[in-house]
Amino acid sequence: MAKKPEKEAPAPEGEEGAEGEAPAKKKPPILIIAIAAGVLVLGGGGAAAFFLLKPKPAAEAGEHGEKKEEKKKEKKKEEKGDKKDAEKGAEGAAGTPVIKEGPDGVVFYTLPDIVVNMQTADGKSTFLKLKLTFELPDEETADELTPNLPRLQDMFQTFLRELRPEDLNGSQGTYQLRVELLRRVNLVAAPAKVNAVLIEEMLIN
């Protein structure tokens, strides 16, 4: 009799387990890659946020602060300068002569108002206010007068204080006042010469 073919021996359980587990072993590498990519993304975002939100170095902050302080100081200086210029302009308007061109080449030189306390017989205070304008032949004479203005004002003040109110009464008194003022101003202006003294305003109070 012929022998029955022998049955194939069943494959060991270990081998089947090995074949069944083979596909499962491929999953861990994919998971690791995904986790690594996520870590990189999060790490990159964190680094960007760190650099963006990172406080400026102390040196840069100090320079920025110094620039602000310098701008503030410059602004204050400009404001002070503007204020001083305005004050000087106001002083100039009140204490310097006004020079204007007149007809036929003459120049009008108006002095700041002169106020003096005059003598009176009864001892009462009487004030004289004068607004005087000189008629000059040219601008060069005005240039000669301006530096000597303090001397001229002192000379006028001394002379006017010696006057009494009755000395200025009538046209004769006004004429005599012009003559005396013209003589004195030409003493200061020499060798230049003032043509005339014009009394624009005269008040006695």
Curated annotation (Swiss-Prot):
Transmembrane stretches, start-end: 30-50
GO biological process: bacterial-type flagellum-dependent swarming motility; chemotaxis
Keyword Phosphoprotein in record: no
Bias-annotated ranges (Basic and acidic residues): 1-10, 61-90
Keywords tagged on the record: Cell inner membrane, Cell membrane, Chemotaxis, Flagellar rotation, Membrane, Transmembrane, Transmembrane helix
Effect of deleting the gene: Forms a complete but paralyzed flagellum.
PANTHER family tied to this protein: FLAGELLAR PROTEIN FLIL
Function: Controls the rotational direction of flagella during chemotaxis.
Protein name: Flagellar FliL protein
Species, as recorded: Caulobacter vibrioides (strain NA1000 / CB15N) (Caulobacter crescentus)
Gene: fliL
